[in-house]
From Swiss-Prot:
<feature type="binding site">
    <location>
        <begin position="203"/>
        <end position="205"/>
    </location>
    <ligand>
        <name>pyridoxal 5'-phosphate</name>
    </ligand>
</feature>
<keyword id="KW-0001">2Fe-2S</keyword>
<comment type="subunit">
    <text>Homodimer. Forms a heterotetramer with IscU, interacts with other sulfur acceptors.</text>
</comment>
<dbReference type="GO" id="GO:0030170">
    <property type="term" value="F:pyridoxal phosphate binding"/>
</dbReference>
<dbReference type="InterPro" id="IPR015424">
    <property type="entry name" value="PyrdxlP-dep_Trfase"/>
</dbReference>
<dbReference type="GO" id="GO:0046872">
    <property type="term" value="F:metal ion binding"/>
</dbReference>
<feature type="binding site">
    <location>
        <begin position="75"/>
        <end position="76"/>
    </location>
    <ligand>
        <name>pyridoxal 5'-phosphate</name>
    </ligand>
</feature>
<feature type="binding site" description="via persulfide group">
    <location>
        <position position="328"/>
    </location>
    <ligand>
        <name>[2Fe-2S] cluster</name>
    </ligand>
</feature>
<dbReference type="GO" id="GO:0031071">
    <property type="term" value="F:cysteine desulfurase activity"/>
</dbReference>
<keyword id="KW-0408">Iron</keyword>
<keyword id="KW-0663">Pyridoxal phosphate</keyword>
<comment type="function">
    <text>Master enzyme that delivers sulfur to a number of partners involved in Fe-S cluster assembly, tRNA modification or cofactor biosynthesis. Catalyzes the removal of elemental sulfur atoms from cysteine to produce alanine. Functions as a sulfur delivery protein for Fe-S cluster synthesis onto IscU, an Fe-S scaffold assembly protein, as well as other S acceptor proteins.</text>
</comment>
<dbReference type="InterPro" id="IPR015421">
    <property type="entry name" value="PyrdxlP-dep_Trfase_major"/>
</dbReference>
<dbReference type="InterPro" id="IPR000192">
    <property type="entry name" value="Aminotrans_V_dom"/>
</dbReference>
<keyword id="KW-0479">Metal-binding</keyword>
<dbReference type="InterPro" id="IPR020578">
    <property type="entry name" value="Aminotrans_V_PyrdxlP_BS"/>
</dbReference>
<dbReference type="GO" id="GO:1990221">
    <property type="term" value="C:L-cysteine desulfurase complex"/>
</dbReference>
Length: 404
């Protein structure tokens, strides 16, 4: 068993060996290395053909038309292109956007930028289980609302939003619906024929593809228009200029095809491991799951261990590659804004760990993780005066702490 054990699949996934092998055929002189936009010779034609196949594979994953797939550098760019692209194109119709407080920074910071440009953004508060109630979304809608951006699966707590209901509501009001599917594409079935979603952001490295590649689904019927954010040679039907990275696109396509074929078996195995992990640690006193346990993606478990400081717990769990918060924000010592939005206090938010399980996680690794977590919590609580006070029956909320 290789240490540390990788339990941070929500941050990134290793490239599946089958994907890596396929990608390697599109890089060197011996392979298909041409520019897909070179129309005058075979090197270009072969590369273009490979891109076309990959485009269809990504489209198949969400039951879309291949012409609705735009390749980008990842979900961050897809989110920027979708949100800014809609805002700038439809700004004559209205300048109001709705999103939620628990979105990824790539959505929140894009909305903040639009606020600086004169747009108005409503940030919806989730329930304690992490899910946005439909009536709250409907109440926020106005005549000048042009876009709703709600993620499919949350990156920190793994809860699943009812995107079918959100899509129905948006369509009935004539509002464009963008869904960040970085954490759900390849893990949950997505069908754009039944779900009324207009724009979907997809990430390669969250589904065993390479980093630096993603896609944006842009609905054709009814047609969604975007203002390009990257200008140049007019690639990707004018929506995203830049030479197409054939090897990465092929990798994304192959990853999508594998994810589609193996989704059901992968999910069943991963859910079993996730439940084994939770059943192995839930007996630890003052341990709580964050987010809804029923509407949750199979590989995700976000747990708060009360009276244990998150950073010291991370250090104690050095044999486990886990995170507190998401990789994009865990570099700062701020408590997770997602958990704060759920109503957790700073202490509980600080004592949370995100475990995310994936395709290559084994039962042996989960057994080792349970043992490590149990021992570490016991050891840290032995050293904690707060734990001692709690065990003595002192209500810590009533304690008058002296200020120095």
């Amino acid at each position: 068993m290789k240490l540390p054990i990788y339990l941070d699949y929500a941050a990134t996934t290793p490239v599946d060996p089958r994907v890596a092998e396929k990608m390697f055929q599109y890089m060197t002189m011996d392979g298909i290395f041409g520019n897909p936009a070179s129309r005058s010779h075979r090197y270009g034609w072969q590369a273009e053909e490979a891109v076309d196949v990959a485009r269809s594979q990504v489209a198949d994953l969400i039951n879309a038309d291949h012409r609705e797939i735009v390749f980008t550098s990842g979900a961050t760019e897809s989110n920027n292109l979708a949100i800014k692209g809609v805002a700038h194109f439809y700004n004559k119709k209205g300048k109001h956007i709705i999103t939620s407080k628990t979105e990824h920074k790539a959505v929140l910071d894009t909305c903040r930028q639009l606020e600086r440009e004169g747009f108005e953004v409503t940030y919806l508060e989730p329930e304690a289980n992490g899910i946005i109630p439909m009536e709250r979304l409907e109440a926020a809608m106005r005549d000048d609302t042009i876009l709703v951006s709600i993620m499919h699966v949350n990156n920190e707590i793994g809860v699943i939003h009812d995107v079918d209901a959100i899509g129905e509501l948006c369509r009935s009001k004539g509002i464009i619906f963008h869904m960040d599917a970085a954490q759900s594409a390849g893990k949950l079935p997505i069908d754009v024929q039944t779900t009324k979603v207009d724009l979907i952001s997809i990430s390669g490295h969250k589904m065993y593809g390479p980093k630096g590649i993603g896609a944006l689904y842009v609905r054709r019927k009814p047609r969604i228009r975007l203002e390009a954010q990257m200008h140049g040679g007019g690639h990707e039907r004018g929506m995203r200029s830049g030479t197409l990275a054939t090897h990465q696109i092929v990798g994304l396509g192959e990853a999508a095809a594998i994810a589609k074929a193996e989704m059901a078996t992968d999910n069943a195995r991963i859910a079993k491991l996730r439940d084994k992990l939770w059943n192995g640690i839930k007996h630890i006193e003052e341990t709580y799951v964050n987010g809804d346990m029923t509407h949750r993606v199979s590989g995700s478990l976000n747990v708060s261990f009360n009276y244990v400081e998150g950073e010291s717990l991370m250090m104690a769990l050095k044999d486990l590659a886990v995170s507190s918060g998401s990789a994009c924000t865990s570099a700062s010592l701020e408590p997770s804004y997602v958990l704060r939005a759920l109503g957790l206090n700073d202490e509980m938010a600080h004592s949370s760990i995100r475990f995310s399980i994936g395709r290559f996680t084994t039962e042996e690794e989960i057994d080792h993780a349970i043992e490590t977590i149990t021992q570490s919590i016991d050891k840290l609580r032995e050293m904690s005066p707060l734990w001692e006070m709690f065990k003595d029956g002192i209500d810590l909320n009533q304690v008058q702490w002296a200020h120095h």
